Amino acid sequence: MKVTCMMIVAVLFLTAWTFVTADDSISALEDLFAKAHDKMENSEASPLNERDCRALGEYCGLPYVHNSRCCSQLCGFICVPESP
């Protein structure tokens, strides 16, 4: 019983200590999201915009739709153009 009470008091103390000594995390997250949004407005800031894809007629592997290896995302052992 005494050990349980001591554990509860210790957990409460450590929880309170964490909240008292923590930085203002809400404003820190807001700043982080604002910075991320500013970077995304500049399209050249994102390395995801540069795709390394294969041109039409190049080997792409197993045939399936939405193949990220092909710029057209259509693979039939070779990259094929999208149908209109």
Curated annotation (Swiss-Prot):
Tissue localization of expression is: Expressed by the venom duct.
Q: Where is the signal peptide?
A: 1-22
Q: Which Pfam families match?
A: Conotoxin
Superkingdom is: Eukaryota
The record's subcellular location field reads: Secreted
Q: What is known of its domains?
A: The presence of a 'disulfide through disulfide knot' structurally defines this protein as a knottin.
Job of this protein: Omega-conotoxins act at presynaptic membranes, they bind and block voltage-gated calcium channels (Cav).
Which protein, by its recorded name, is this?
Omega-conotoxin-like ArMKLT1-02
Source species: Conus arenatus (Sand-dusted cone)
